[in-house]
Amino acid sequence: MFYRASKPVHNSISHIIFALFGKDRVIRQKLIRPERTKKRSVMKLTFIGADHEVTGSCHFLEVGDTKVLIDCGMEQGEDVFENQEIPVPASEVDAVLLTHAHIDHSGLLPLLYAKGFRGPVYSTTATCDLCRIMLRDSAHIQEFEAEWRNRKAKRSGGPEYIPLYTMEDAVCLLEQLVPCDYNEIIELFPGIRARFSDVGHLLGSASIEL
């Protein structure tokens, strides 16, 4: 049985549904507002650096199967030339978001590359420019320190020292930088967007809204 609409029926899906199922509210709601079958992915954020100190900023974001690092910084105040491990499998990281160029936020990016990371590194244009200087300089320090320590080790019979990363690692990582403008909405992956906002800490520094 069809129900007569109390008002003229316009040529729209909702009006047609109301005309056909006007008295059956349950059916009407299901047809007009069908239930969502796709569940939203859970966003999980893990603090794996600078959670108990200022330096070594590194945060691990998981959204479904997507894995993103926010910063990948070097700890300072320790012997920064000692080999360090990236706390997540580098080859599984899909992208990096970088807040600014200070080494305690960016200094382990070349090590991330050396261990297998090949994804994009998003940061502001000014941060990209500074990283091209600072990460090369950091790589030079790593290689120089390793050479100096190995000369000492050779005399004392100690083990060979391997730098955190090389200039080649730094240069290759720099090729993966993706410059972004402030307040630009960046589609990282389907359903994951980011926006950089100016915070005034350093040229190019930003807070990141996800």
Where on the chain are the PLM-derived regions?
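Active-site recognition of the HExxH zinc-binding catalytic motif
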Residues: H100
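Short, Lys/Arg-enriched N-terminal segments with co-localized hydrophobic residues
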Residues: I17, Q29-V42
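His/Asp/Glu-rich metal-coordinating catalytic cores
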Residues: M43-L97, S106, L112-L210
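Intrinsic-disorder-associated, low-complexity terminal segments enriched in Asp/Asn/His/Tyr and depleted
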Residues: Y3, H10-N11, H15, D24
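Short, low-complexity intrinsically disordered segments enriched in small and basic residues
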Residues: F2, S6, V26-R28, I32-E35
